[in-house]
């Protein structure tokens, strides 16, 4: 008998709760009438990947793409004469299954982090053996080496930083880093 009384009390409580929420549920209507969930905002510096095939092997660079957004970049956000992570967020990563020559630098097959040393003229590309970095601070003493880059001025400001491979040949290419009005580049070739 006690069990029947408890069940009756629970059923009455459930019915009361349901009747109290019925008007609210009725106002909600169909799920299709409900507003859409907010969409995620795009990342301010989204990730990017660029690849090139040299001698039948794929060289890959992973980086993040910061934007100018009205800021002075070279000599401002990216100060001269200080090592820069060359992108945003995680460090820029080079993956090569073959030995390369980047500028004057011999780079064995492997995974590396790319940094740059910007100046008002000739930059240096830094290939670091330390990987898995966020991008800053720069890991002093982990350089595989540094090589000079060449400089071209872009005819118009480029809003979003990019890394690209240009002038692609079967066994060589140029690595270009472009942002604002700066185009820094270096030749990359499959090592012989």
Mark where each language-model region is:
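Generic structural signal for beta-strand residues in well-ordered domains
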Residues: 17-19, 105, 168
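Bacterial N-terminal signal peptides
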Residues: 9-20
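Primarily secretory-pathway and cell-envelope proteins
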Residues: 27-77, 82, 131-192
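Mid-length scaffold segments of soluble, non-membrane domains
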Residues: 83-137
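Bacterial N-terminal signal peptides that target proteins for export
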Residues: 1-11
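Sec/Tat signal peptide C-region and signal peptidase I cleavage site
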Residues: 21-26
């Amino acid at each position: 008998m006690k069990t029947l009384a408890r069940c009756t009390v629970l059923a009455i409580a459930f019915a009361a709760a349901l009747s109290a929420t019925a008007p609210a549920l009725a106002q909600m209507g169909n799920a299709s009438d409900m507003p859409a969930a907010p969409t995620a905002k795009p990342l301010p510096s989204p990730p990017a990947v660029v690849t090139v095939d040299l001698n039948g092997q794929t060289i890959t660079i992973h980086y993040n793409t910061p934007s100018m957004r009205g800021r002075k970049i070279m000599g401002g956000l990216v100060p001269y004469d200080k090592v820069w992570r060359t992108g945003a967020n995680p460090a820029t990563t080079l993956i090569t299954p073959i030995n390369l020559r980047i500028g004057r630098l011999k780079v064995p097959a492997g995974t590396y982090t790319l940094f740059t040393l910007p100046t008002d003229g000739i930059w240096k590309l830094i290939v670091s053996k330390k990987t898995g970095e966020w991008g800053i601070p720069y890991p002093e003493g982990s350089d595989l080496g540094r090589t000079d880059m060449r400089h071209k001025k872009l005819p118009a400001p480029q809003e979003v930083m990019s890394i690209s491979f240009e002038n692609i040949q079967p066994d060589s290419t140029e690595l270009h880093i472009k942002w604002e009005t700066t185009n820094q580049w270096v030749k990359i070739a499959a090592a012989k």
